[in-house]
């Protein structure tokens, strides 16, 4: 009984546990760093005017120019989607404590754009600003085909789990057997990278650094063990 207790303590301290006699459970993690090949940005036009119709008209005109510019830059129509249309009253408040009154109207037209050639991103940002874009609500870098990188991370996670199992089995003086169960945990996809507000300028090309994305995977494996 003393030997069995020592085995359980050893394995527990190492991050694994014997689920039942003849079985050992381990977890493995894998990560792959990859350069993103796509950017997803949300941009828009906002305009304020005394008349609601004027606000909508001006915003629509600028949005139309931006859509035409994106088309001219080679952005496919399937990669451009209107994500928000809004019209709100702008209230003016008085120091006397009187109720606020409508002073103007603000119209906003926002689109989400996928840029499949990251090298064009700086040019796209600069050109749409020139055409009237005055709102940038986010920039995320992504992968067009993440599956192969996810599979690489999974293979690394499985290898990590097996290496742990072999180590624990050797340390405990038992023989590692076949895989009895394997399950995938919550992997972590590429994290979005925020765009700095300072990038909103009408230069020839806005400098943007894509960096790297990390694709992660996690597995839990159950092995048989024998004396």
Question: Predicted segment positions?
Answer:
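Short, charge-dense linear interaction motifs
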Residues: 2-5, 14-227
């Amino acid at each position: 009984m003393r030997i069995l207790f020592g085995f359980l303590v050893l394995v527990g301290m190492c991050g694994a546990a014997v689920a039942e006699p003849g079985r050992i459970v381990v977890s493995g993690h894998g990560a792959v760093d990859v350069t993103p090949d796509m950017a997803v940005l949300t941009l828009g036009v906002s305009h304020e005017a005394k008349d609601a119709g004027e606000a909508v008209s001006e915003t629509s005109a600028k949005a139309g120019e931006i859509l035409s510019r994106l088309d001219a830059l080679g952005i496919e129509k399937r990669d451009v989607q209107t994500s928000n249309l809004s019209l709100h009253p702008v209230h003016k408040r008085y120091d006397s404590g009187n109720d606020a009154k409508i002073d103007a109207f603000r119209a906003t037209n926002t689109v989400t754009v996928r840029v499949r050639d990251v090298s064009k991103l700086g040019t796209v940002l600069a050109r749409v600003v020139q055409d009237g874009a005055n709102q940038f609500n986010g920039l995320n870098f992504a992968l067009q085909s993440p599956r192969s990188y996810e599979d690489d991370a999974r293979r690394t996670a499985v290898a990590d789990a097996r290496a742990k199992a072999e180590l624990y089995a050797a340390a405990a003086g038992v023989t590692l057997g076949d895989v009895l169960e394997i399950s995938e945990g919550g992997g972590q996809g590429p994290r979005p990278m925020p765009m700095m507000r300072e990038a909103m300028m009408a230069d020839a090309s806005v400098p943007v650094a894509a960096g790297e994305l990390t694709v992660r995977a996690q597995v839990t494996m159950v092995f048989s063990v024998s004396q």
